[in-house]
A protein has these predicted regions:
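Conserved N-terminal/central alpha/beta ligand/cofactor-binding core
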Residues: 38-42, 46-162
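A conserved short coil-to-beta-strand element within the FAD-binding core of flavoproteins
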Residues: 168-179
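Conserved small/polar residues in nucleotide/adenosyl-binding loops
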Residues: 181-188
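Conserved S-adenosyl-L-methionine
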Residues: 24-28
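Beta1/beta-strand and adjacent pyrophosphate-binding region of the FAD-binding site
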Residues: 2-11, 31
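Aromatic pocket-lining residues of Rossmann-like dinucleotide-binding sites
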Residues: 21
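N-terminal Rossmann-fold NAD(P) dinucleotide-binding loop
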Residues: 14
């Protein structure tokens, strides 16, 4: 297998990297290797009745697979430099916010339209916090909700699946340098 770009992991970083490559350099041959399952196969066996605790699956569907650990979350996306990461330290605060808004636009395009964008800036709650010597960090937060978050991921996968080669259930163990311009990824194929 030879690819121009190999992405390890199909969490948000991997998904949006693949997305951007399909838009900016559609002629590149791109592969995404993911230790977990594709989205539709991600199911945790814990049902609360027969199975009440973790059974130690080879690939934890809660934590890994297409969409990453947040695939089944309530779909809150923070648009802020005040917490949650340090991207702004590398590219600047305005550029970081612009990228976060760009990702938000993509989420809206792929199924999140109509969801609410909340903000703490200029709210009565912020005023009350300040009056009581509490510092409320400013943020805009897009709340997709669990169901819409899943739909956005389904739609992104539908867009990507014909443009990128996905290898699910394929954890990468090591990456070695072959030459100045080439790397080799070593995989462990899981028998499922």
């Amino acid at each position: 297998m030879r690819y121009d770009v190999i992405i390890i992991g199909a969490g948000p970083g991997g998904i949006f990297s693949a997305y951007e490559l399909t838009k900016q350099a559609p002629d590149l041959k791109v592969a995404v290797f993911e230790a977990g399952h594709e989205l539709k196969r991600r199911k945790c066996p814990i049902d609360g009745t027969k199975i009440k605790s973790c059974v130690g699956c080879d690939s934890c569907s809660v934590m890994s697979g297409f969409g990453g650990a947040g695939a089944f979350s309530d779909g809150k996306y923070n648009i802020t430099n005040d917490f949650g990461g340090s991207l702004y330290e590398y590219i600047g605060k305005n550029e970081a916010i612009d990228l976060m808004k760009y990702v938000d636009d993509i989420n809206m395009e792929y199924g999140g339209e109509g969801t609410k964008l909340y903000s703490t800036a200029g709210t009565r709650f912020k005023t009350v916090c300040l009056q009581n010597r509490l510092h409320l960090l400013d943020a805009s937060v897009r709340h997709l909700g669990t169901d819409i978050n899943y739909i956005v991921l389904e739609n992104l996968y539908a867009y990507l699946q014909d443009k990128v080669e996905f290898y699910f259930d394929t954890p990468i163990q090591t990456v070695e340098t072959v030459s100045y311009t080439h790397l080799r990824a070593h995989e462990t194929l899981m028998n499922l």
